[in-house]
UniProtKB/Swiss-Prot annotation:
Family: Belongs to the complex I subunit 6 family.
EC number(s) reported in the record: 7.1.1.2
InterPro entries for the chain: ComplexI_Subunit6 (IPR050269), NADH_UbQ/plastoQ_OxRdtase_su6 (IPR001457)
GO biological process: mitochondrial electron transport, NADH to ubiquinone; mitochondrial respiratory chain complex I assembly
Protein's name according to its UniProt entry: NADH-ubiquinone oxidoreductase chain 6
Catalyzed reactions: a ubiquinone + NADH + 5 H(+)(in) = a ubiquinol + NAD(+) + 4 H(+)(out)
An MF annotation (GO) of this entry: NADH dehydrogenase (ubiquinone) activity
Function: Core subunit of the mitochondrial membrane respiratory chain NADH dehydrogenase (Complex I) which catalyzes electron transfer from NADH through the respiratory chain, using ubiquinone as an electron acceptor. Essential for the catalytic activity and assembly of complex I.
């Protein structure tokens, strides 16, 4: 039952991303991003990451609401464009939904999806010993794998955020 619940949440997550990537109007794009962020936090909470899910929900979505409020106020249109008002935007949205449905049917037919990475050195990570048995904390393992195996992701993300701040400063300055 929980597998289907996560599968439905993942589908809503991707549909929300398709909704805001087709960006008909900033208002609808922001709503799609907020829905996808909330559903992503629910997925994280389902996999026993309650602290991480709660922090992302409070910090990310709290910040998103502030940014969304300012951008929606600055880019407000008298007649905002919806997904069905432009044939190109509607075609992009429908083709994205079609690709998602093909992926859903493939996963349901095959029954599994492979993983790209295999983590063989789990002994290097933090193990909590309780009497004769030990266990890994999922949040500690996730953070340690992010900074060991995914250091390239941290570098690219940091650089992207830096460039985004520089671009925003140049746009608002008028240069």
């Amino acid at each position: 039952m929980m597998t289907y619940f996560v599968f439905i949440l993942s589908t809503v997550f991707v549909i929300g991303f398709v909704g805001f990537s087709s960006k008909p109007s900033p208002v609808y794009g922001g709503v799609g991003l907020i829905i996808s962020g909330g559903v992503g936090c629910g997925i994280v909470m389902n996999f026993s990451g309650s602290f991480l899910g709660l922090m992302v929900f409070l910090i990310y979505l709290g910040g998103m609401m502030v940014v969304f409020g300012y951008t929606a106020a600055m880019a407000m249109e008298l007649y905002p464009e919806v997904w069905i008002s432009n044939k190109v935007v509607l075609g992009a949205f429908v083709s994205g939904l079609f690709m998602e449905m093909l992926l859903v049917l493939y996963v349901l037919k095959e029954g599994s999806v492979g993983s790209m990475f295999e983590f063989s050195s789990l002994g290097d990570w933090v193990v909590y010993d309780v009497e004769d048995s030990g266990f890994f904390s999922k949040e500690v393992v996730g953070i340690s794998s992010l900074y060991s195996y995914g250091v390239w992701l941290v570098v690219v993300t940091g650089w992207s955020l830096f460039i985004a701040v520089v671009v925003i400063m140049e746009v608002t300055r008028g240069g």
